[in-house]
């Protein structure tokens, strides 16, 4: 699942991706944030205590840093891990697997456990030794236990999507669904195997399915892909195989908690245009303990990575912890009326592998207009439906340490995000291009044919994206004042770029150009220079502005710098100088042999140094 929670360490962000992806730590190594995001998303932590509330020398240094970065990425991300029998175990002390578990294991046991961990991204060794029917703590708000539900509710088909999942994890997902869903409500379970190469998911899984179906004929269906289609198209495959009035689309590394189904089916029975997400808790990847997560809505940033949000103010005012939480988007696992899902266009099967489809669905439902509709409502919010998170429906989900699903997740998410932007986001599509640091014209990225999706939007009579931002996602920060963006380079040393430096400091630096988030620069019509991430919501204070502080360049939170009337306005024209309006000092490079790349940023009397930025949207007037 893709949703983030904010941290303030050198490991700057962890992103959780839906479906067959998982948790990836976005590492800022050697002052470089490797922005290869994948499944929890940069986001505001919901309130935890209230559930309601010289050239050779330079080259060698670069190589050393890149080598270190590569090693970290291999350990933490491992885009394409070897099979269990092929994986070479790292030194035990280097693996996060043994930080809180496994000290009592023999060396051989640790070796086996580590091989499986490298392959699956979670502790399959431990999972194989846990009962399939293990109990879970009831983490629902206390009021949920007193709720009553209609006797007559629609049946549900539960769909599990997987590729190379550990068999015990998959079986525990199935078992918990069967044990904790009332039998009269659970019509069937559908397993979508996206072309797994793991042999135990063939013969052994077939034996299990045959055993269950021997007692309940046809209860478990298996859909096997002949090639890997990716999470998005796998979900659609599962929907096509489903026959119940309601379809629940889930990852295959979850465990259902007691009473999860009745609240969901009740809300859909009341209004079939509701798309529902349960509230998620965490199954820790190392020791499989259940970690309670605060209640949260689900949103996204301008790269369209999912992120957890604090519930809206209107929800807090209810003072009712059992009330549904209105949510701008979905993180990936959701429950939907089967026919309604088809009416609004399912998922965009022109997307690749993973990412963006959950955001697209949430926006689409929101923008659909009710006017003139017979059977086809628009994209959930824009198109007449709604998205809710239910506090009384709780499901635990494994956040993997790394994912086995794709070698380049970021490229897929970026491409999919641009499809969403071009179809649904109107003039705000520029924000997606800016966040990804991509030219808005001739981006060089083939997003495929979007004709059918544009026709769908027209057919569904969806509202504008501006309406969505104002009415559904008012927390989303708008950046209509940005007139230039990209990386900022000085003519004196063009292989170095302005960089935000370590997260823990406020001193900008110059660093070898890599084009990732720490080097993103945004120049506004009010002559401010933002460096680093585009803060997604108005509640975040992540935006940092370049400021002249006692003749030294510093990065200060923009809102604070403005309130304190600091020197944060800069005259800049493409190929010209960057001069502070008040102090008249220029941002320049100065040779310094003590610095890593031989140069440092200074503010001094202008000497004629020239700066260029990658993308200019409007004329820059100095």
From Swiss-Prot:
Glycans are attached at residues 146, 195, 320. Residues 324-400 are annotated as: Catalytic subdomain B. One of its GO terms (cellular component) is Golgi membrane. Substrate binds at residues 194, 400, 405. PANTHER family: N-ACETYLGALACTOSAMINYLTRANSFERASE, POLYPEPTIDE N-ACETYLGALACTOSAMINYLTRANSFERASE 18. Belongs to the glycosyltransferase 2 family. GalNAc-T subfamily. This is Polypeptide N-acetylgalactosaminyltransferase 18. The gene is Galnt18.
